[in-house]
Amino acid sequence: MNTKKKILDAALDLFSEKGYANVFVAEIAEAVGIKAPSLYKHYKSKRDIFNAIIEEMKKNYNRQAATLSIDGNNAMSDAEVFSAASEDGLVKMGFSLFSFFLHDGYTQKFRKMLTIEQFHTPELAELFTKQYIDDSLKYQSGIFSLLCERGILKGDNPQIMALQFHSPIYMLLTMCDREPEREKELTSLLEQHIRQFVRLYSKGDNL
């Protein structure tokens, strides 16, 4: 592992344990086993490290989305994939993405850091809301809107559909964070949730 990657890993470990605001560059350098001046050869500041962590997370997410043949951010293109998926296929995709958010080291620790910091740092509170609520709801409501327009789903309010779909999944994710021993039980609920949602809103045989 190269030094830049070691710095990111050490920084994220510290951020997730102490919160972003309570970690200093010297601590990160010490955790890596280098001096602070050496760290600055790789990253200009703590914020630069933070931004690099976000970029690493995006890369990880994009790789995971690609394994499912979706973009993961573009509702227009992904609606085609979801419209052709069976109920079992949607459950499989849901499990894959849920497992990624739950177990990917960067994503898991970053979420923990944001949970800590959301009540102390307004900027990070906004980032938390954007990443785990606003962006997800926008993406999902976009997909539901397109599927309703094509007569695949029934429903006249894609935003409410997105709330109904996303909120239980986010709740299950946070419960798994707090009580990892319940993962099997909670992922069973995830499957039931996806299947019930599909059956409530599906109009055709694909979904």
Feature-to-residue mapping (PLM):
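Hydrophobic/aromatic residues within well-ordered alpha-helical segments
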Residues: 46, 53, 57, 61, ...
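Short, Lys/Arg-enriched anionic-surface-contact patches
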Residues: 1-3
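Amphipathic alpha-helical packing segments from all-alpha helical-bundle domains
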Residues: 102-115, 119-149
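Amphipathic alpha-helical interface segments
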Residues: 10, 14, 56, 96, ...
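Hydrophobic alpha-helical connector segments
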Residues: 52, 65-104, 161-162
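Helix-turn-helix
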Residues: 6, 14-56
